[in-house]
């Protein structure tokens, strides 16, 4: 059974990767889908985010990266995927995610959402926290892979 793990991944963190690795043990294939949310302003470009996700899936045999600029349900339907994986850090995540899951289900009746609780050591972690810490020169190596840390340093130094 295939699953989609969608997100902005701006940038991908060890919290995202924890959910990905655990999902890859449950499902036959996991597509990590880099998406655009019209309500978000991104730090990294779409292609930069996809490139980082491609590196993140390299060591996971049954995971692959992809990107899409439309509705998740449209991608899922076209790809024949009926499972969406989402990570939850706190009850506030659940409140938003349950709404999205219901909307997705209304648009694609066969689509189910599976929630995985994040590892407690990542329960505070978000891409925005990583970006903020990196913007002040903080050490983000506990939260992101080395290639993401380097990309953050390049962006904040102005040498993209």
From Swiss-Prot:
Subcellular location: Cytoplasm
Cofactor(s) the protein needs: Mg(2+)
A GO cellular-component term linked to this record: cytoplasm
SUPFAM superfamilies: Nucleotidylyl transferase (SSF52374)
A Pfam family the protein falls into: CTP_transf_like
Residues the entry annotates as binding substrate: 8, 40, 72, 86
Pathway: Cofactor biosynthesis; coenzyme A biosynthesis; CoA from (R)-pantothenate: step 4/5
Database matches in InterPro entries: Cyt_trans-like, PPAT, Rossmann-like_a/b/a_fold
Catalytic activity: (R)-4'-phosphopantetheine + ATP + H(+) = 3'-dephospho-CoA + diphosphate
Molecular functions per Gene Ontology: ATP binding; pantetheine-phosphate adenylyltransferase activity
Enzyme class per UniProt: transferase
Enzyme Commission numbers on file: 2.7.7.3
GO biological process, one term: coenzyme A biosynthetic process
Site features described as Transition state stabilizer, chain residue numbers: 16
Keywords: ATP-binding, Coenzyme A biosynthesis, Cytoplasm, Magnesium, Nucleotide-binding, Nucleotidyltransferase, Transferase
HAMAP family: PPAT_bact
Record PANTHER family: PHOSPHOPANTETHEINE ADENYLYLTRANSFERASE
Family: Belongs to the bacterial CoaD family.
Purpose: Reversibly transfers an adenylyl group from ATP to 4'-phosphopantetheine, yielding dephospho-CoA (dPCoA) and pyrophosphate.
Name recorded for this polypeptide: Phosphopantetheine adenylyltransferase
Species assigned in the record: Kosmotoga olearia (strain ATCC BAA-1733 / DSM 21960 / TBF 19.5.1)
């Amino acid at each position: 059974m295939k699953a989609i793990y969608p997100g902005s991944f701006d940038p991908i963190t060890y919290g995202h990767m924890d959910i990905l690795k655990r999902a890859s043990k449950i499902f036959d294939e996991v597509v990590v889908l880099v998406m655009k949310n019209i309500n978000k302003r991104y730090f990294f470009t779409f292609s930069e985010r996809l490139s980082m996700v491609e590196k993140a899936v390299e060591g996971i045999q049954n995971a692959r990266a992809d990107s899409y600029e439309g509705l998740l349900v449209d991608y899922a339907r076209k790809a024949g995927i009926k499972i969406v994986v989402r990570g939850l850090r706190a009850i506030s995540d659940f409140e938003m995610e349950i709404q999205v899951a219901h909307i997705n289900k209304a648009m694609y009746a066969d689509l189910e959402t599976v929630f995985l609780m994040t590892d407690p050591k990542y329960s505070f972690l978000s891409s925005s926290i990583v970006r903020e810490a990196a913007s002040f020169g903080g050490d983000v190596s506990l939260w992101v892979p080395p290639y993401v840390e380097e990309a953050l340093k390049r962006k904040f130094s102005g040498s993209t």
